[in-house]
Amino acid sequence: MVKNTEDKPLAQNKKARHDYEIYETFEAGIVLTGTEIKSVRQAKIQLKDGFARVRNGEVWLSNVHIAPFEQGNIFNVEELRTRKLLLNKKEIAKIDKELSGTGITFIPLKVYLKNGFAKVLMGLARGKKDYDKRESLKRKEQNRDIARQLKAYNR
């Protein structure tokens, strides 16, 4: 019996939501070799320091670590190599225009399988300042306290 792994995140970049304000997301395919996709299916991928750039009308993902496949022998490739992302031309043009602004970056948020293909959820993001991070933590804590009080009140 085949497990249903569709849209189940194989890797998430949790630090991205803390360090960046994400204002637009894109779903992109990723070009991988055979041994890389096998490692991705085993969830041996890290998105922590990843980012993407537009070069010559193509989007390239850098600094994403995919561990070498254990039985891959000579077919394994470099772990941190740049990988091509598959997006529509209109999306690439929009991303290129946004990235030309200052303080904007294009980062991977999660990797998942969709219809057997590896997909990367990418986000256009602006870096948060330290006081923004503290403010969002306070807001999150206040919301938790309110939810806790409502739960106690409704019992």
UniProtKB/Swiss-Prot annotation:
Required for rescue of stalled ribosomes mediated by trans-translation. Binds to transfer-messenger RNA (tmRNA), required for stable association of tmRNA with ribosomes. tmRNA and SmpB together mimic tRNA shape, replacing the anticodon stem-loop with SmpB. tmRNA is encoded by the ssrA gene; the 2 termini fold to resemble tRNA(Ala) and it encodes a 'tag peptide', a short internal open reading frame. During trans-translation Ala-aminoacylated tmRNA acts like a tRNA, entering the A-site of stalled ribosomes, displacing the stalled mRNA. Belongs to the SmpB family. Signal peptide: none annotated. One of its GO terms (cellular component) is cytosol. Its main location: cytoplasm. Keywords: Cytoplasm, RNA-binding. This is SsrA-binding protein. It is found in: Cytoplasm. CDD domains: SmpB. GO terms for biological process: trans-translation. One of its GO terms (molecular function) is RNA binding. The keyword Endoplasmic reticulum does not apply. InterPro entries: SmpB (IPR023620), SsrA-bd_prot (IPR000037), SsrA-bd_prot_CS (IPR020081).
